[in-house]
Amino acid sequence: MVGSPRADGRCATLANEMFEACIDECPEDGVSVVAVSSVDVAPCVGCDACRKALSKDDDAYPEIPEKGDPLAQCNLVFRSDASAHQCVIGDDMAEVRKHLDAADELIVVSPVYFSGAPAQMKALLDRMQPYFWSNLRERTKERRPCTLHVVREGGDPHGFEPLVGVVRSALGVAGFKLECLVDWLGCFDEDGEIVADGRECELD
């Protein structure tokens, strides 16, 4: 998962290198990249449909629409006929969820914007809310490993703890556990090329 809104920046360079390395080292495994720069994911609007959909098995709720107006009138389906963690907003988040559900491991590469995630990345993370409601009954499931690679300039005196917190929280409800944090400060040259390895940091 690449959290930068720039399609060809340093995060993309790092993600592409890791993608190629994964293919070379584990050719039998499937590897996919989800970049916020190339997906259409709207922010959560707090409509509460995902919570209401899971309140009772017999309650009807809006069917997932095709891409388009998220507020458009939808048909109703029953809870028992649909996935447990769907959102009524019709955009690319449905495809993102398919990748998350199929993943055995997750790697996140993100820049730091004012100590936190870019708006596009934050919007995607906020859309994990349906997982929260569906997982209220499934807390015992084993979580899959997640690694966060932080690409930053280092000029913010407040660090990047807010980024770590939101990634850990949002992906936690999606079934992942943040196990490794890698800081790439000073590891890129002026042209955006990788010149050094990232440094693994301790997680609180």
Language model: regions and residue ranges:
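Short, glycine-/small-residue-rich phosphate/pyrophosphate-handling segment
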Residues: 119-120, 137-181
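Short glycine-rich anion-binding loops that position phosphate/pyrophosphate groups of nucleotides
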Residues: 112-114, 153-154
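Short amphipathic alpha-helical segments, especially helix-boundary/capping motifs
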Residues: 101-102, 110, 141-146
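N-terminal beta1-alpha1-beta2 submodule of the flavodoxin-like/Rossmannoid cofactor-binding fold
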Residues: 1-109, 115-133, 180-182, 186-203
